[in-house]
């Protein structure tokens, strides 16, 4: 198979694409892949590091108000479609896949106009603007949440789950918590606001430290690089008991997930895919700063299934954080029930499912 894939801007668009590429290579080591992204997005660093053929397109998103910038955006979009057509003619893909982000709009649209099979993957429960636009042109639409189905043409939709789930589903316990001087036999809570950290989650966690120090469970608090120094400088040398550890960033987060009893964090699509694939109980604090409040919708899908609890960011304090963790970590039965419900929602073969969709559209 010759696969052209496009997505970018955030990890939520990039990691599903990389998971699909891994699955394709596992099935067909001779497969050829080209990734089209932007020169400024996260993909410009991550994708070439994997040894994947990488091309760039210059594009920007629409402003939500009337703006001269939107005139420039239309011009850049049309120009980027021309560039995408050149890449497509040179690479000759069997199928073109978009995983979200403005750049995928130009690439997938160009492919559809050239009568090349096209598929888009929507990671969230609320459909992104690019995928909404592309839905009328593509052959198939893969979704990760059932709640996204009604937002697309019904005959095109296939439920596959998020390919990222397959990458983490088979990870086993490896004693990874030992590197943080944590005991693998004691239940551990992970507090994590995403790769950049989340100020409100961090503030609540800092306020909770005096109580967390007293608990018989462990806490691993990951602040995000930009917040770490300020938080550490604000704590005295004796502020942390041995059962509470603070880290700026964890390079290989999937490796520690099987050893975590509870996660408190955001409700991004990648996080949801990981915690359901592994069946980890979670306390979700959706970001209120994302488009169409899609993280709340993502979280609600788990809450409705008894697989997670939800705390609005405005309601998150040190006290509410400790109460939520206590409720799960001091009740093995409650935790096991939630873990089982989370596991039921997981799709550990999501990348293979999406790969099958690609095979069906290739004429």
UniProtKB/Swiss-Prot annotation:
Q: Where in the cell is it found?
A: Cell membrane
Q: Which reaction does it catalyse?
A: Mur2Ac(oyl-L-Ala-gamma-D-Glu-L-Lys-D-Ala-D-Ala)-di-trans,octa-cis-undecaprenyl diphosphate + UDP-N-acetyl-alpha-D-glucosamine = beta-D-GlcNAc-(1->4)-Mur2Ac(oyl-L-Ala-gamma-D-Glu-L-Lys-D-Ala-D-Ala)-di-trans,octa-cis-undecaprenyl diphosphate + UDP + H(+)
Enzyme Commission number(s): 2.4.1.227
Pathway, according to UniProt? Cell wall biogenesis; peptidoglycan biosynthesis
Q: What does this protein do?
A: Cell wall formation. Catalyzes the transfer of a GlcNAc subunit on undecaprenyl-pyrophosphoryl-MurNAc-pentapeptide (lipid intermediate I) to form undecaprenyl-pyrophosphoryl-MurNAc-(pentapeptide)GlcNAc (lipid intermediate II).
In the record, the note on similarity to other proteins reads: Belongs to the glycosyltransferase 28 family. MurG subfamily.
Native source organism of the sequence: Lactiplantibacillus plantarum (strain ATCC BAA-793 / NCIMB 8826 / WCFS1)
One GO molecular function term of this record is: undecaprenyldiphospho-muramoylpentapeptide beta-N-acetylglucosaminyltransferase activity
- Please list the GO biological process terms of this entry: carbohydrate metabolic process; cell division; cell wall organization; lipid glycosylation; peptidoglycan biosynthetic process; regulation of cell shape
Q: Which UniProt keywords apply?
A: Cell cycle, Cell division, Cell membrane, Cell shape, Cell wall biogenesis/degradation, Glycosyltransferase, Membrane, Peptidoglycan synthesis, Transferase
Lineage start: Bacteria, Bacillati, Bacillota, Bacilli, Lactobacillales
The domain of life is: Bacteria
Please report any disulfide bonds recorded for this protein chain, giving both cysteine positions: none
| Endpoints of the signal sequence | none
Report membrane topology: Peripheral membrane protein
Residues annotated for UDP-N-acetyl-alpha-D-glucosamine binding in this entry: 10-12, 124, 195, 250, 295
Chief location of this protein within or outside the cell: membrane
Q: Which NCBIfam families match?
A: murG
The name this protein carries in UniProt is: UDP-N-acetylglucosamine--N-acetylmuramyl-(pentapeptide) pyrophosphoryl-undecaprenol N-acetylglucosamine transferase
A Pfam match is Glyco_transf_28
The gene name reads murG
Q: List the GO terms this entry assigns under cellular component, sorted alphabetically.
A: plasma membrane
Kindly report, in one word, the top-level EC class recorded for this enzyme. transferase
User: Where does the sequence pass through the membrane?
Assistant: none
